[in-house]
Amino acid sequence: ALDSKKVAAAALDVFCVEPMAPDHPFRKHPSLILTPHLGASSEEAQEKCGIEVAEVITAYLLTGEVRNAVNLPFLDARTYEQVKPYMALGEALGKLLAQVVPQQVDRAHITYGGKAQELPNIDPITRSVLMGFLARAAVKDLNHINVRGIAGTLGIAVEEKRSNEPVTFNEWLHVQLFKGDEKVGSAGGTFFGSPSNPRIVRLFSNPLEIPLHGTFLMFNNSDRPGIVGYVGTLLSKHSVNIANLSLSRDHAGGHALSVFHVDSEPPLEVLEELRRDPVFSNVRVVKL
């Protein structure tokens, strides 16, 4: 039935011969999950086990609560509601860094500051950061359960820190990426007013304000008059509307990082024209 796709997938816990032979075809079937034998021998016990499994799955799908999982830390519904906004923020930070850090990394350092350090469980947030960062990698079947293991397989050590050091924001999530001892990328986020209003507010130590979703034209540029007008005219020429703009500079006349939030992806002609101009560097489109 599995081979013919009449049954899409199945999970089994009782077998005619236990333990099952090492070369049994069930062990490698892509649509079959083998679970521990529950040992419910009576009809009543089997019915109650089935009900309990259904309740656990329902709770996870409806509220995010994780109960009795053998490969994921326990997460009750109340804690899930607390960490859920941070999970979205963390995944966005990971996605952003995956698109702006041009090299492989071997260490990810995640700092929980302000009220974030008081969260009862930060593991789901760390997993979300890794999910975002590894989403563009050629990784099959990436999910919250295996993402830590896959990060380790790729040579990425994960460090978490609850910090009580003073920070600018009441709630602070900061991700730093390293290659050896060199920091190759960093991004930080917070919430403006409430968990329903998250923002990315740091990129490579530059203060910015970026929403978690959308298409963004990013580049470094010389800080001089006319840059915003020039880019705006260029985008308008190609019918690309600007939804928002955030920029940061080191000092007047120095270097700047500009982020244009656009309603549609700029065509290649826009990117090529900017790249030909020595005023601009690191021109890229980022999607969150």
Map each language-model feature to its residues.
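Rossmann-like dinucleotide-binding domain for NAD(H)/NADP(H)
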Residues: 1-100, 118
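A conserved regulatory-domain signal marking ACT and ACT-like small-molecule sensing domains
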Residues: 74-288
